[in-house]
Amino acid sequence: MRYFLEMVLGRLVNHPDEIDVEETSDDRGILFRIRVNPEDLGRIIGRNGRTIEAIRSLLNAASRDNRRVFVEVEDGEGPS
């Protein structure tokens, strides 16, 4: 699933070489923390958060074993 997320993000941003995805897992589900070039934050989040919500929906639909998937985008000031 991490590869899928990195592939989607790579197509959205202008600086694909600066994508950093950190994955952690526990009994509640899987957490992906995304860090990108500050210029690409708007492209990842989208208008009114629509793009990041679509990414979250895709990851939850692709999740195996019905595990929840959480996605946080970090902007240098912490997760959002």
Task: Label each residue range with its predicted role.
Residues M1-L41, T51-A54, L58-S80:
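RNA-contacting regions in translation and RNA-metabolism proteins
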Residues I45-G49:
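Glycine-centered tight-turn and secondary-structure capping sites
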